[in-house]
């Protein structure tokens, strides 16, 4: 195994196992969604990349659009709404990406 992609729960366990077996140089780990422990593992070099999806904004936008349709009787302006996706690495894990929003 030279790479692991984690799209759900289990990030902490996988990262810990790779770290305990001292294989972080051989096994590249990419996962979704940042958290305090993910940031720590990125800084240690155990996790190589994190795809941050902004789940707060995703949830907010979905409920706002639904609320506008049902309660506000407002027309939906588009059939697709995009939220930002940030790729975080060791070099930029601490950077605030909010300022980069378009």
Where are these regions (language model features)?
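Short, well-ordered coil/turn elements that cap or connect secondary structure elements
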Residues: 24, 44-45, 82
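Hydrophobic alpha-helical
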Residues: 1-37
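Short beta-strand elements at the ligand-binding edges of bilobed clamshell
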Residues: 44-56
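Hinge/cleft segment of the Venus flytrap/periplasmic-binding protein
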Residues: 57-102
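Hydrophobic/aromatic beta-strand patches that form the interior of the parallel beta-sheet core
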Residues: 5, 30, 49-51, 88
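Flexible loop/hinge segments that line or gate small-molecule binding clefts
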Residues: 35-43, 47
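Electropositive phosphate-/nucleotide-binding environments in soluble metabolic enzymes
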Residues: 8, 53-56, 60
């Amino acid at each position: 195994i030279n790479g692991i992609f984690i799209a759900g729960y289990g990030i902490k366990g996988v990262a810990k196992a790779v770290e305990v077996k001292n294989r972080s140089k051989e096994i590249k780990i990419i996962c979704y969604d940042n958290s305090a422990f993910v940031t720590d593992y990125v800084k240690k070099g155990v996790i190589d990349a994190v795809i941050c999806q902004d789940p707060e904004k995703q949830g907010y936008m979905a409920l706002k659009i639904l609320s506008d349709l049902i309660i506000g009787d407002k027309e939906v302006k588009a059939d697709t709404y995009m939220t930002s996706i940030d790729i975080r690495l060791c070099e930029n894990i601490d950077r605030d990406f909010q300022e980069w929003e378009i």
